[in-house]
Amino acid sequence: HRLGLTWQQPTGEGPLLLRLDPEDDGTTLLALRHTMLLDAADFARTGPGALAVGWEITLLALAAHTDGWHATCLAPVPVPNPEWLQGPQSARYVRAWAVRWAAEAIAAGIDETTARLGESETVRRHLGS
């Protein structure tokens, strides 16, 4: 199943594609693709992680509020409520996501210095540090 939407936010709008694919083990794979056109200077400063980590948190909330993850996750999925978002576990998640999105940027051809600056900015925006 596929669902195409237009995602609007203060910085602009872009296409959002959600795809649900059944897996052989009875679970369902959710794929999300959000495309945003960003100013080159903004992207150089933030990289993909600044926007992507917001989606990571959203998908974590979805996983925490559904039962499907029980079959595939080795540990309980945290609920990203306001208290959790201010805590140390959230900080570890945000830092890990920022590192992974920087690695994705490097793999896509962004130079490492720019990607690592974006990683730092992503952490700063989401954690205030």
Give the label of every model feature segment.
Residues H1-T27, R33-A41, L127-G128:
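Hydrophobic-ligand binding "helix-grip"
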Residues T35-S129:
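Terminal "cap-and-tail" regions of soluble proteins that handle hydrophobic small molecules
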